[in-house]
């Protein structure tokens, strides 16, 4: 395959992947979460296309564990975002399907909010089936690829959600290509959690919703950078 990280697999390899994928625990603890995935070509311009592999896998992981109308859905970075249903029966088929999306665009976070709210209102979705967290996953920085994300835009979105009895989802912007291990998690003025890097511990911390200063500190202390000191 031209992307490299999901090359042609044997029947046995596909079966093993399907079994491994199906056995993954639910780190979301039954909370709905929706991935907004950067599918542009730059995600593949790294060794082993790791950012793309991580982003697409997270999109699939969160989508499969959602309940209600957001089950098996993700959103692609776009100026006109849409809820995209993930198709395919096996892990390999579903990952292949996600790889067919490759729009080169910033994401319009205001339009993402409107998309989710409109879907919820139209389908009478209860609060517990609304995504608690939106994961915006990219290889770029927040300010470089997110539009309509001012403090006033967030305040307006929060008000619109409240008018329909909903809470605005928490936003986690995840730069999966960043090598910044000094500040794996920060927050900007909009209250968006900015996550940098891609490690199993960071994944566990982010999906648990535990973005406390203590957890952030432990992520830094236990990073490879300080391994010799703590040994």
PLM segments and residue spans:
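Acidic, glycine-rich A-domain
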Residues: 1-231
């Amino acid at each position: 395959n031209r992307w490299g990280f999901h090359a042609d697999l044997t029947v046995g390899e596909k079966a093993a992947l399907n079994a491994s994928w199906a056995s993954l625990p639910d780190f979301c603890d039954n909370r709905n979460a929706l991935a907004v995935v950067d599918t542009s070509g730059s995600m593949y311009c790294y060794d082993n296309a790791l950012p793309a592999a991580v982003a697409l896998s997270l999109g699939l992981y969160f989508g499969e564990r959602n309940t209600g109308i957001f089950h098996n859905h993700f959103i692609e970075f776009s100026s006109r975002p849409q809820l995209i249903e993930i198709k395919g029966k096996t892990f390999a088929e579903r990952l292949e399907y996600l790889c067919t999306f490759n729009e080169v665009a910033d994401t319009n976070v205001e339009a993402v909010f409107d998309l989710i709210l409109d879907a919820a209102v139209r389908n009478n979705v209860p609060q517990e089936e609304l995504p608690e967290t939106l994961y915006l996953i990219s290889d770029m920085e927040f300010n470089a690829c997110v539009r309509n994300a001012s403090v006033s835009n967030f305040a307006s979105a929060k008000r619109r959600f409240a008018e329909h009895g909903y809470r605005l989802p928490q936003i986690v912007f995840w730069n999966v290509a960043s090598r910044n291990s000094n500040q794996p998690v920060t927050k900007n003025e909009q209250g968006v959690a900015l996550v940098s890097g891609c490690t199993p511990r960071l994944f566990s911390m982010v999906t648990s919703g535990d973005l406390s200063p203590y957890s952030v500190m432990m992520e830094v202390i236990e990073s490879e950078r300080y391994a010799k000191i703590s040994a």
